[in-house]
Regions:
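Conserved catalytic core of the tyrosine transesterase superfamily
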Residues: 1-317
Length: 317
């Protein structure tokens, strides 16, 4: 009923739900998001993350930003950091630095308060990548077998993620015009509006074709992937794609180290390197800005690492 009501609201057939209006976003945060969207090409999921941190800072320290002090900004971050883990703290630091630099650019205060944001202890590339084995990938794909729209869609999503290493937002944003059947390629527009055309593997193309043959033709969107329940709208963000992966992992009874779509991106990257794809070529497919990011996945090939490991010298007492 909720989906049907939203559909009627979107069509203007019935009024929206009554109730208290959500708190409005501060004008400075709106201007901040607009600037980053226009000048930096930042996508909506990242902007929402930035906006949460900026809004929290404004409501804590007050909107009279020219009165802010470095110590107050630092105390705000340290308090929030004590309530969450390292990844969340790192995301908050990125948001706050971007917002404070924007305010400085606008001349809202003198000095650069972004310098007051401390760094969080983090050793780059210190963790092993989280990925699935080849057998687990096969089980995951098999868990999407079926002829109904949802299973065909899930299979196409899983294969697109695990074969091409796309991000969840990339998959959610795919349009029908991004698929070039004649050349067998897929155009992807990723972070910073960076465009790349990737070769379409046979199994991915077959899965997409089977899904599109069953996809409702009368829906008002050119997005490739849509929700299976009427009115079959596109995914609002990559979270919907990650939800598809999460449910498929559960059906396959796979106890994965992570549950979202990024697990399959890690798996694709690791598999490329295991099969001898050079780092620079794997980085092009994954659209990494630095080869160091791609090298992170080389650590997952334990068999290869054993071949180059040096014997530990014996020490005579």
């Amino acid at each position: 009923m909720k989906l049907f009501h939203r559909h009627l609201v979107a069509r203007g057939i019935c009024p929206s739900e009554s109730g208290p209006n959500p708190p409005s976003q501060p004008a400075l945060v709106t201007a901040f998001c607009d600037w980053f969207r226009t000048h930096r090409g930042v996508k909506e999921p990242t902007l929402r993350q930035y906006a949460r941190g900026a809004t929290d800072l404004l409501r804590t320290l007050g909107e009279d930003v020219d009165q802010w002090k470095a110590q107050a900004v630092r105390d705000f971050l340290l308090k929030r950091a004590s309530q969450c883990g390292t990844p969340t703290t790192q995301a908050l630091i990125t948001s706050l630095r971007a917002f404070l630099r924007f305010l400085n650019f606008r001349g809202e205060f003198r000095g650069d308060l972004a310098l007051a944001i401390p760094a969080v202890a983090h050793w780059r590339l210190s963790r092993l990548p989280r990925c699935l084995s080849a057998d687990e990938v096969n089980r995951l794909v098999a868990a999407c077998d079926g002829t109904d729209l949802r299973r065909l869609r899930d299979r196409a999503i899983i294969l697109t993620l695990v074969r091409l290493g796309l991000r969840s937002g990339d998959v959610a944003g795919l349009r029908l015009t991004d698929i070039n059947w004649n050349s067998g390629t897929l155009q992807v527009i990723g972070k910073g509006r960076y465009q790349v055309r990737l070769p379409l593997p046979q199994d991915v193309g077959d899965a997409l074709l089977r899904y599109l043959e069953c996809r409702p033709a009368n829906i008002d969107t050119d997005h490739v992937f849509v929700r299976s329940n009427a009115p079959c709208r596109p995914f609002a963000s990559g979270d919907g794609v990650s939800s598809v992966v999460k449910h498929a992992l559960k059906r396959a009874n796979i106890d994965a180290p992570a549950k979202g779509a990024h697990l399959l991106r890690h798996t694709a990257a690791t598999e490329m390197l295991r099969n001898g794809v050079p780092l620079d070529q794997a980085g092009l497919v994954l659209r990494h800005r630095s080869i160091n990011m791609t090298a992170y996945y080389a650590k997952a090939d334990v068999t290869l690492l054993k071949q180059i490991a040096q014997p530990w010298p014996e020490v005579n007492a």
